[in-house]
Amino acid sequence: MTHPNRTTPRPATVVRCALLVSALVAGAAACGSGGGHPLASRPYDATGQVVFAGLPGDGRKADPDKPLEITVKDSEGPLTDVTAVDATGRFVAGELAADGRRWHSTEPLAANAHYTVRVSTEDDDGAPGRRVLTFDTGAPVSKKRLEVTFGPDAGTYGVGQPITATLSRPVKDPAQRAVVERALKVDSTPSVPGAWHWVDSKELHYRPKDYWPAQARIRVHSHLDGIKIGDRLWGAKTPDLNLKIGDKVVAVTDASSHWMTVYKNGEEINSIPVTTGKPGFETRNGVKVVLGKEYNVRMRGTTVGISAGSSESYDLSVYYATRVTWSGEYVHAAPWSVDSQGSANVSHGCTGMSTGNAAWFYENVREGDVVKVINSYGDDMEPFGNGFGDWNVTWKKWQEGSALTTKKGPQGDTSRLQPTMV
């Protein structure tokens, strides 16, 4: 492509302001105040200067398995910026070569997507050029899909409720995990810092650095639909999940003093005499989260490894049972131990209280509320697998469980990553 008044290239004076993400998003191309500077002119049509490799030119859909590559013709001026975005607002990450003559995508294109690509160039005088291209990608050849199920169910929860993402297939490769995690978004109002943590190859948990703010609203959504995750594996569509957070309710049980103190939005609202696990059956220390409530539960010692007929054997009908672990730890009514409540630990691991106090607790907590045990001789609460012990993991360790974390620290949201010079 020929432009009038070309002179010998002046690479030392080339101004490259199009790499500013804010300028791209706003559609602005100026980084000066005009006054005759070449960049103050209207961008020329760079159609003859830019080559899109791998895109069919006959109206056929592009193969989502192939990367997007953009180059400039020989003797033409360099690329200064490239953005590629689909109809849902997902940006494609890419790299711009140091000499400005080639840009290529560094993450897969989505299948069945409509893309708009905006290319910025300049001529030898530094005058800006622009080309815009749209194209569609076709369906993936493979039928293998990765489905994601978000949890918990829609509803209102306590400030300790983690978000879960359960995968239909195991994902073990670190690069594939990064693709999956980058596509799973959690937005909250008010906004708070948070991160995903890979529990295993099929489950991720998300939590904020601290508990959710009281009365927060949370939206969980996936951009994985149509995204290539690995060889012959593509993301499937996932419904959004919307949650509400209620009041901040935290119950702290001191096993050494045999009392539970309940706080609501930072204010003490009740103090309850309790009994916790006796020697050999000590209650777990640490932060737990309410998993559910059952008005009546049959509790048998055989379900926790106590032999039938032994001196520790029991078979009881228990009321106002608030579950905090899957292995059978509850806060519940224990009328048979009222004389010990507030003075001794005589249970098999549960937190027992009078029927009246248990009914009050049952009515004033919800799933996701925090139940913390301190000063027990029991083991520490497991982070995963026995309820939600997520809050017993330090924030630093939690971030290390993200696939987007490097030795330099956790990466930010890269869904809008712009091209970088290499």
Name what the model sees in each region:
Residues 2-28, 32-247, 274, 412-415:
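Acidic, low-complexity Ser/Thr/Gly/Pro-rich repeat segments typical of extracellular/periplasmic
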Residues 60, 107-110, 155, 159, ...:
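Extracytoplasmic/periplasmic, Sec-exported soluble proteins
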Residues 69, 116-118, 132, 164, ...:
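Extracytoplasmic/secreted envelope proteins and their assembly/folding machinery
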Residues 121-123, 224-226, 266, 296, ...:
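Short, charged beta-turn/beta-strand-edge "cap" motif at the junction between a beta-strand
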Residues 124, 140, 213-214, 284, ...:
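A short, structured loop/turn motif at beta-sheet edges
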Residues 159, 285, 297, 301-422:
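Exported/periplasmic cell-wall-interacting domains
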Residues 229-339:
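Gly/Pro-biased beta-strand-loop elements
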